[in-house]
Amino acid sequence: MILITRPLAQATNLKSLINNLGIKTALFPTFEINKIKAEIPKQKFDVIIFISANAVDYAEQYFNNIIVEPISIFTIGPITAKKLIEKDIKVDGYPKNNSSSKVLLNMPYFKDLKDSEILIVRGKGGSEYLKNTLQVKNNVNYFEVYERVPCDLTRLHSQSIKEFLKVDDGVIVINSLESLSLMIELVNKESKIFLDQFKTREIIVLSDRIKEQAKILGFKKITVTLNPSDQDVVDLLGSKNNKKITRI
């Protein structure tokens, strides 16, 4: 069984792909995504960085205001880049294998970047690492277009916990540091014993950064996907190392 911690509105495709492998799934949303009213920046930018696919979706109505040529457009990873390309927006670069701010900043373009106006399109809150690094030599602004609202513990969460713990070979899919933190909080509210059991299960994470935090929190069996796409997660689950997973 696979525990999916994404917002319910974004879990459908992954759930379907996993079920098609003959593997059961349980939904465990840790937060939901809400659109927020964004203040349109007045200045022109040299560089725009989109942090997530959600950032692309919720900023789309502002594209005519913020994407003014000449401009260079980057994303935090391939999924976000694909989302922009689908909307006919040219993407100048992105980390190909590991979606992270650190990998993005190691690209040659950013190592030499200075005296530029940069806009980071993202959700409200989150890591300040990218901005703090870039603003040493540049002027950096945020354009926040959505917010993450943590989920309360519901009947769905309680049912999913119990179903998930009925099998010994369950796998948890974690998309972000926030998902990891909120999952622990929700499971702990249900039962400290359940949380201890969760930490014995394998988890699949989407970056080395999440892996390191999961280690600190007590998880032992941690796998990082090569790419954070639904298909890569499914390919990993369907690989030889995961044939032990209880199937439908």
Regions found by a protein language model. Give the residues of each.
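Signature of uroporphyrinogen-III synthase
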Residues: M1-I248
